[in-house]
A protein has these predicted regions:
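G-domain G4 guanine-recognition motif of GTPases
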Residues: 8-9, 128-129, 152-164, 178-184
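Beta-strand-loop-alpha "switch" segments that mediate conformational coupling across diverse proteins
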Residues: 158, 167-195, 213
Length: 220
């Protein structure tokens, strides 16, 4: 299964959700933001190299703690050399080899978001509480559906005690509230899923529930 993690704008915690969800699903995590990568980068080849034909996908997959990651480079030259049209084939190859793949998409409604969405079987929408953020999520959902990536789940980030039903109606998917958590917030910076730092906390249990919702969609 190829799962795209997307959102209507930056700053909603999309990369945080992607990293922690990949750990929960035992999936390969791909940083699909070719221009503004967020996930930690190792010392080997990266997605820019793969999309430029300089490396095979399996050569660029690295272990980041307990998660396998295909990171993306951060150089302008690398981004220019990469062919985004090849991304779908790369994701398909990873899924054939490893099973589940989680793609951290570029933020917002940029044109390059469409490539991983077109390759994905489903998506997780990440949003924040509040009407403006959910409205951005609606636009992200419309884009995902246009490319054939149905909504597997909605991650309502940095929320606790918020009514989920209005969000579910607006975004067309089962919503899971992820409460504020220092371990979640630091996951991308430290390259460590929250469950390795705060096992058993409300935030970790919420990520586990998000994983269950995605798995139920996969088996439906």
């Amino acid at each position: 299964m190829i799962l795209a993690v997307t959102g209507g704008k930056g700053g909603v915690g999309k990369s945080t959700v992607a990293l922690n969800l990949a750990a929960e699903l035992d999936a390969v995590l791909v940083d699909g933001d070719l221009a503004m990568a967020d996930l930690p980068v190792g010392s080997g080849p990266d997605l820019h190299d793969v999309l430029a034909g300089r490396a095979a996908p399996f050569e660029a997959v690295q272990r980041l703690g307990e998660v396998l990651v295909l990171p993306c480079g951060r150089s302008l030259a690398g981004a220019r050399a990469a062919d985004p049209r090849a991304l779908g084939g790369v994701l398909g190859d990873l899924a054939a080899t490893h099973g589940d793949v989680v793609v951290d998409c570029a933020a917002g409604l940029k044109a390059d978001v469409g490539v991983p969405l077109a390759a994905a079987d489903a998506c997780v929408l990440v949003t924040l509480p509040g009407v403006p953020a959910v409205a951005d999520g609606v636009r992200a959902r419309e884009l995902a559906v246009r490319f054939g990536a149905g909504v597997a789940a909605v991650a309502l980030n940095r929320s606790d005690g918020v009514a989920l039903e209005p969000v579910e109606r607006a975004l067309g998917g089962r919503a899971v509230a992820l409460p504020e958590s220092r371990a979640l917030a630091a996951a991308v910076r430290d390259g460590r899923p929250a469950r390795t730092v705060e096992a058993g906390t409300a935030a970790v249990e919420a990520v586990r529930e998000l994983g269950r919702v995605v798995q139920s969609c996969k088996s439906a």
